[in-house]
């Protein structure tokens, strides 16, 4: 029974996407920020518990990255629709995720392997994205943070979008193109 705790935490993070997005739409950015930080901390907690107590499950390995992606995309769209992030930036982020999603699906279908795991640049991209969302919500809540902090975080996200996509295309993309040629 205790072994289900990481999956329960992950499921809660999955469900938090809805209130986070709603609070951003309503302009209740501080509450959205609080829930977003809680969701982010839960990501570390579920992974820690699963590894420490060997509560790793196939379901958890599937659900955890899905919950992370829903949290990021849900928050991204809410920030876009409330004009807290520029649309060109949102399209760039969604395009990156689309490239990785299509590539991962092709890789899985062609090689029947999930070896196309997130690379270190993708993990940095996620970290910078989370930092950006926190900065945007902090600025919207308190208006005391200078806008250049957002620009620095956006530059970091863009940098890791480029690195992660190039790295992905050089490795998994090369194998996919060899297979279909």
Task: Put a short name on every predicted segment.
Residues 1-181:
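Alpha-helical transmembrane bundles and membrane-interface segments of multipass inner-membrane proteins
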